[in-house]
Design a protein with these regions (language model features):
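Intrinsic-disorder/low-complexity, polar/charged segments enriched in Ser/Thr/Lys/Arg/Asp/Glu/Gln
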Residues: 24-28, 44-46, 57-59, 142-144, ...
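Active-site/ligand-binding surface loops and adjacent short beta/alpha elements
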Residues: 83-84, 88-160
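Acidic, contiguous internal or C-terminal segments within carbohydrate-active enzymes
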Residues: 33-80, 206-209
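Targeting-peptide/extracellular-domain and disordered-appendage signature
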Residues: 76, 82, 88, 199-206
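A short, structured loop/turn motif at beta-sheet edges
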Residues: 18-25, 51-55, 86, 174-178, ...
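Active-site pocket scaffolds in enzymes
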Residues: 151-209
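Membrane engagement elements in two modes
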Residues: 9, 30, 140-141, 154, ...
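Extended, loop-rich substrate-binding clefts of extracytoplasmic carbohydrate-active enzymes
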Residues: 2-54
Length: 209
């Protein structure tokens, strides 16, 4: 599959409920996805989603554990895709960008003329663009990235830790009918498995890790 089998495996609901901190109520749900194969990996993803009642923040915590007995490679990338109405002509990509370190669309960029900060409306015959940015962090080591629509007063911000997700990509698919922008924090470069191994950057999980 395009991004690994885990994306098409149903989760098993392992719990849900309400927890309290003083007079603050938090709703939570937790699920487990198991990806396993004979002579292959046995990985378990535990995801917890939590929201404080009355807030506009959703907190998601993922933990991947190797339940098998083979040393197993581990790569992780989120695809946080935002579309209309937040994404429209004039929407802004806001992030603590220090530098552009890689782009996947050098052959088409000059003709398309779309940069990484200000977004146009839906395009015809648009070829997807992917930017990798070197990001700064706040005092807690976090990287806040947002897509903001000033006209509507709407936006979405995703915050991750740079020590957990050192790579961050902006995916632009501005083609009419598929119009979306992806905020994509990743443990590795999107060149994939082979590149991570060749560079000595692959994360390996042993049993119980």
């Amino acid at each position: 599959s395009l991004h690994g089998r885990v994306g098409t495996i149903p989760a098993r609901l392992s719990g849900y409920g309400t927890r309290w901190e003083g007079d603050r109520a938090f709703l939570w749900a937790e699920g487990v996805v198991t990806q396993a194969a004979v002579f292959g990996e046995h990985l378990e993803l535990t995801r917890r989603i939590e929201v404080e009642v009355g807030s506009d923040e959703i907190r998601m915590t993922d933990e991947v554990t190797n339940r098998g007995f083979y040393k197993t490679p581990h790569m992780y990338c989120y695809h946080i895709n935002v579309g209309h109405p937040v994404l429209e002509d004039g929407a802004r990509y806001i992030a603590p960008i220090r530098d552009v370190v890689w782009a996947a669309h050098a052959d088409s960029y000059d003709g398309q003329g779309v940069g990484y900060r200000a977004l146009p409306g839906p395009q015809t015959d648009f070829h997807e663009q992917v930017w990798q940015h070197e990001m700064g962090t706040d005092a807690e080591g976090e990287v806040p990235v947002a897509l903001v629509n000033d006209r509507l007063g709407l936006g979405l911000m995703a915050t991750t830790r740079k020590d957990q997700f050192p790579c961050l990509y902006e995916w632009q698919n501005l083609q009419a009918g598929q119009y979306a922008l992806g905020i994509e924090p990743s443990t590795h470069h999107v060149l994939g498995n082979g590149a991570a191994r060749d560079r000595g950057e692959m994360i390996w999980l042993t049993h119980g890790q």
